[in-house]
Amino acid sequence: RAKSEGKDPAKMRIGMAFENDGFSLDVRAGVLDVAKKYNMKIVIDDKLPADLSDMSATLTKFKALKPDILLVSGHSKGAATAARQIEEMKIQAPVVAITHCEAAKVHEKFPKSANGMMCPTQWLSNLPKKDAYFGTASQWNEDFKKLHPSYSAVPYQTAQASAAVLVFKDAFERANSFDQKQVRDALAATNMETFYGDIKFAPEGNNIAKPMFYRQIGADGSYKPIVSPADMTFPRKANY
């Protein structure tokens, strides 16, 4: 967003905290790559406590140093802790981004701090993608909400799980066998479109056929897809 407004990204300062697990450390590695690319300064680089119940030490540093961006990755419990303590400590930052917003239901439990939060996601319900089994992305989203009305915002992991079933079905059919190696080879050769997006695996096993996305939580608790920097509400201003 800074670059799109003619500002120097190198002047943006980052404060971040991550759970000490494979997923979150992968996220951290990605942040480090982007920060290096744009010469952005990381002023806080913390590990969340093992029980994910308290990140006040990080937030105290954040209030003192006043970085432009706060990043947190700690699965659902970490997201809930972050949203709760951001609200308790009245953290103001131009950008706040945390993983697992939907699964933690931060928009319902902590609406004040959730307002303006950026939430990375693997999937959007308005993607122009479809398949023969679940239909379009929006159809899958509507069907899921009918079956599980407790979800006001559908976590992308649920869509991911449905897509995984389609991948296995396709691989088993192409392998025409339950032999482990043949099925593995068929999975590795996957190249298909689903309601979740295109799926094709790199040798390392990650899906290289689709990008990541962001959604931003509004004051009404809705999740707005961020397709371009212009879609983003910036800076975030929470009303505590």
Q: Where are the model-predicted features located?
A:
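Extracytosolic ligand-binding ectodomains
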Residues: 1-240
